[in-house]
């Protein structure tokens, strides 16, 4: 298997990729990168989860480093995908002075115009808003040498086929290298290829991650204010060897990590603002079992190749199928079984159905565990830990205290009291998570009115700075090296139980 350096990627970019956890190129990256560096047009038929963003993004960074002005334009069907692609490009280009700007509908155009005036090398946008900027001449095409169409079939389904033609016609074929990626190749896309591309190199690859039968996929319906309680109950009952937890934003990752630490879990967070040195430190801890919970954003976790991840928890539901693919693909590797659980607000069920329709299979509904299940799991865990502690030599002063207590109390009552304290430790620790509204309902008809609308579909609600306190009061002076055990047990959702899951 060729590595990135052998494919022609610079040492600086290879160093960045290694820090991100990318050790070897995926098949589509291995096939596409050499053609991209040679300047050839590429027609990539790739399903989600195959690494296609890296297939065009990694060599693109090599082509724009040291250049000024807009060098590359990337079209995406939705604002969410545009933002995701842009964030990953920023990750690929860390420390290389590459500027990436996003343009899409639903955001003030004046702010985007100011960003374009700063001369970014790469622009990522939705078709409608890109055309707005072309018509205003705030996006100039004279320096663009690379045009990339990501998820072209999805743009076609949303009614953007004419917009795609308009944009491709604005950038003369003789000056541009064109890369088009699509999961399917309907006739309209084939016509587009014949009309606007120059003898493209055809690269096909399939999605290995999503076809992996070793991953059991579940969703659980839960309200935002009950999500953290439910999540920690899952951790208590599942007792994952290694778990990756996905949050939608950097703020969410930071707050989740802090909340888990306050509850006694061994957790660290990863997102785009984490330095490379810190990222490497966190990944080393995770691989060496110094921490067992990694909280991450989608982009920060892409490319991670860590064996032994038994569980993936989507604390925030992913906004598209590709993100879901990458998330759950972190588990169920090397022939091992994995479990993926997605938390979903009742009004977000359209997103679950979209993922199911895209992947051709249904997720199973999973009921949050009852109080008795949680307590039983905690008790079993404490029993195992006590047995392990008994193998260690106790300090003399602790033995003296033990003797004094045994003279005053019955041994059975004394041990029971200590065990109860361990089982219920941290139950009253206060946590704070910023309240985030659920995603907007989807229009599942799959057809947009397209032209000039520029990605207004599937917009997220704006985050509100509401604060949500956990249902606990801080208990001072109580510490334990044990994971936090906390539960409210109010859910009555029907579905599979944990006993069913473990059969």
UniProtKB/Swiss-Prot annotation:
Residues 214-375 form the Helicase C-terminal domain. GO terms for molecular function: ATP binding; ATP hydrolysis activity; RNA helicase activity; RNA strand annealing activity. It is found in: Cytoplasm. The keyword Membrane does not apply. A motif (DEAD box) lies at residues 150-153. A motif (Q motif) lies at residues 2-30. It catalyses: ATP + H2O = ADP + phosphate + H(+). Residues 481-490 have a biased composition (Basic and acidic residues). GO terms for biological process: response to cold; RNA catabolic process. Keywords: ATP-binding, Cytoplasm, Helicase, Hydrolase, Nucleotide-binding, RNA-binding, Stress response. ATP binds at residues 46-53. Residues 33-203 form the Helicase ATP-binding domain. Pfam families: DEAD, Helicase_C. PROSITE patterns: DEAD_ATP_HELICASE, HELICASE_ATP_BIND_1, HELICASE_CTER, Q_MOTIF. Its EC number is 3.6.4.13. Belongs to the DEAD box helicase family. CshA subfamily. DEAD-box RNA helicase possibly involved in RNA degradation. Unwinds dsRNA in both 5'- and 3'-directions, has RNA-dependent ATPase activity. Oligomerizes, may be a member of the RNA degradosome. This is DEAD-box ATP-dependent RNA helicase CshA. It comes from Staphylococcus haemolyticus (strain JCSC1435). The gene is cshA.
């Amino acid at each position: 298997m060729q590595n990135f350096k052998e494919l022609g990627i610079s040492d600086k970019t290879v160093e960045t990729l290694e820090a991100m956890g990318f050790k070897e190129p995926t098949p589509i990256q291995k096939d596409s990168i050499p053609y991209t560096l040679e300047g050839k047009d590429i027609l990539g038929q790739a399903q989600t989860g195959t690494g296609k963003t890296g297939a065009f993004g990694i060599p693109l960074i090599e082509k724009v480093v040291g250049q000024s002005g807009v060098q590359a334009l990337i079209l995406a069907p939705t604002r969410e995908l545009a933002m995701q692609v842009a964030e990953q490009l920023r990750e690929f280009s860390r420390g290389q002075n590459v500027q990436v700007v996003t343009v899409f509908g639903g955001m003030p155009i004046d702010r985007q115009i100011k960003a374009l005036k700063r001369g970014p090398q790469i622009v990522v946008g939705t078709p409608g808003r890109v055309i707005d900027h072309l018509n205003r001449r705030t996006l100039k095409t004279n320096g663009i040498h690379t045009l990339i169409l990501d998820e072209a079939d999805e743009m076609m389904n949303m009614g953007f086929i004419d917009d795609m033609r308009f944009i491709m016609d604005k950038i003369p074929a003789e000056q541009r290298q064109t890369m088009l990626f699509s999961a399917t190749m309907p006739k309209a896309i084939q016509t587009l290829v014949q009309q606007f591309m120059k003898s493209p190199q055809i690269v096909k690859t399939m999605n290995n991650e999503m076809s992996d039968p070793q991953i059991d996929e579940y969703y659980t319906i839960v309200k935002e204010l009950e999500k953290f309680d439910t999540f920690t109950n899952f951790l208590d009952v599942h007792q994952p060897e290694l778990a990756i937890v996905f949050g939608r934003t950097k703020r969410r990752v930071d707050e989740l990590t802090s909340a888990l630490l306050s509850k006694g879990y061994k957790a660290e967070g990863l997102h785009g603002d984490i330095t490379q040195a810190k990222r490497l430190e966190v990944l080393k801890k995770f691989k060496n079992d110094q921490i067992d919970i990694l909280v991450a954003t989608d982009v920060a976790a892409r490319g991670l190749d860590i064996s032994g991840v038994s569980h993936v928890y989507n604390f925030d539901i992913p906004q598209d199928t590709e993100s879901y693919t990458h998330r759950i693909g972190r588990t169920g590797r090397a022939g091992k079984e994995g479990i993926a659980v997605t938390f979903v607000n009742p009004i977000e069920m359209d997103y679950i159905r979209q993922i199911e329709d895209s992947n051709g299979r249904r997720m199973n509904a999973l009921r949050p565990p009852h109080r008795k299940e949680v307590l039983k799991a905690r008790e079993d865990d404490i029993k195992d830990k006590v047995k392990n502690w008994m193998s260690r030599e106790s300090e003399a002063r602790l033995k003296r205290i033990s003797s004094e207590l045994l003279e005053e109390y019955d041994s059975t009552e004394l041990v029971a009291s200590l065990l109860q304290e361990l089982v219920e430790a941290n139950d009253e620790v206060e946590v704070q998570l910023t309240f985030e509204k659920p995603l907007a309902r989807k229009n599942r008809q799959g057809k947009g009115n397209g032209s000039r609308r520029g990605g207004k579909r599937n917009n997220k609600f704006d985050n509100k700075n509401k604060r949500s306190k956990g249902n606990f009061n801080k208990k001072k002076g109580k510490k334990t090296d044990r994971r936090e055990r906390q539960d409210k047990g109010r859910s009555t959702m029907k579905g599979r139980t944990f006993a069913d899951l473990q059969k």
